[in-house]
Amino acid sequence: MNRIDIEGYTPDEILDLPDEQLDALALSGEPLVFRAGTAEILAEFKVRGESLIVELAQIDGGGEGVLPTLTSLIHRYATRRGLKRVEWIVHALNCAEPNLKLRRVMERRGFQITDVEGVGKAYYQVHEIGFF
């Protein structure tokens, strides 16, 4: 797999940032737009209890392995923080221009269409840290 940079940084470089800096960038409580490889992603990250909530609202472009790169980075971050699980919420159901490839990827990876409280219908999956 090709190396996928996120805003010009490798996943290792991102994880090398001090916790305070990384938390300020990613856990601001606001939606965040960033580039990963050739994809532009609109996402929000938050910690609730022992879970890291990852909400992907839009992914434009990509296809070169962006999701596996993000998954690995996010799980490594959650492990470092001592969190017990990662909850994935992916809004790929009601897009004006649906990404059919993304839908196939979500289904192949075992995501289920769920009515998520406060969100509505979305692809949803919980990964227990150490069991994914």
Feature locations, PLM:
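Non-catalytic substrate-recognition and accessory regions of acyl/acetyltransferase enzymes
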Residues: 1-68, 72, 76-132
